[in-house]
Amino acid sequence: MNLPKFIKDDERLFRLLLGDLFPSLELPISEYGVLQEAVEAELSKSKLQKHEFLMQKIFQFYDSRLTRHCNMLVGDPMGGKSTAWKILAAAQSTLCKRGTEGFQSVTPIVISPKSVELDELYGAYDLATFEWKDGILSTIFKQCSEDEKPTEKWVLFDGPIDAMWIESMNSVMDDNKILTLINGDRIPLTTSMSLVFETQDLRVASPATVSRAGMVYIDAAELGWECYVNSWLDRTFESDEETKELHKNFFTKWVDKVLKFRELSCQQPVPVSDFNAVVTLCSLYDSLCKVETSFRKDSLGGDYASVAEKMFLFALVWSIGATVNDGSRKKFNACLTDIDAIAPATNTAYDFYIDVAKNDFIPWDNRVPVWRPQKTMTFHDMVVPTVDTTRNSYVTDTFMKSKVNVLLIGNTGTGKTILAQSMLKDLPDTFSQLVVNFSAATTSS
């Protein structure tokens, strides 16, 4: 039960220590048989890669669940934590449907504990009527406890762990397996129920909490962004091996070098992980392919490869390169031109967009509309289009048309609100708008 907690280097050291202490003992190799076949089938069904590291973590989670009713999946975002439990749950459910002995179907119930108040999570007395009102967790526990079906109920806590809410779970996590509420209710954890905590780290978790749970650490660096890209290529170019290979070469040529340069030589006001940056790159390229209707392989013919690489470079600039500050943009552009002269030599790649018909980079200046204020406009309604507003609007609009979430980041007074408001005004009637102001004091109610 110790190996799942270690990073790769520590795992190697641990095995060497075991070899020194028990020189004549060989660790048995676990075989999972039908479960491994089911896991591989679910990965293929979900268009995911059968990565050795991911499968290892899935089986470690499975082994940990056999011995503990409470387990923690720990690791950075986009590292495969959710994928691990989802694939295992689906595989077990599939085996149960086939009638395979020893496996039950799984019903996962996901809770975000930090998104609600403590009273909303566990329950509280109404101060006006002094009546008890169950919270989200107590309601779920009662429903699962009363359910006599053999189906496994996994109660998943997705979010940061801290003493504010986790300490009340200690009696459930230990051998007592009882949730005790402040009104005196004691809800037992049945044999078909188990707890799973999915969190980034355990910095503020007490030793008492950590010691009560099985631990599986999933290192996002071990999985790497290449795994995601391969799955994206399989989904996007499923029936076109030639185009898939072309785009795979784009990633090989550009992405790794650019990511390393960004980490070593550029400053990011809001640091974004390599994995998230590559996910954004794939999303933006997908969105550009949908928005730019003239970007079609059959219509472009022999120019397709050239246009596709320019489009890929544009998406790379506004995904991986979008997080660097103004002072680092020239450095970032120099990195691009060092890799290939396809990148614009004058100004920076941030100053150009792609004209698919001309197969060339065109300055954003050419796309800035001529604007004159209307007599009826008030001063606060006037938004003078510039290169910045034009290119930011284009990228934002491209994402929105493809229903991809957008996050605008910048200092106060840089035009984020104006950009968002102007985009909302131009949305078609198929969209509805809701403006919500958030602050540190905002609650779930």
Model-based region annotation:
Residues 1-445:
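Conformational switch/transducer regions in large eukaryotic molecular machines and scaffolds
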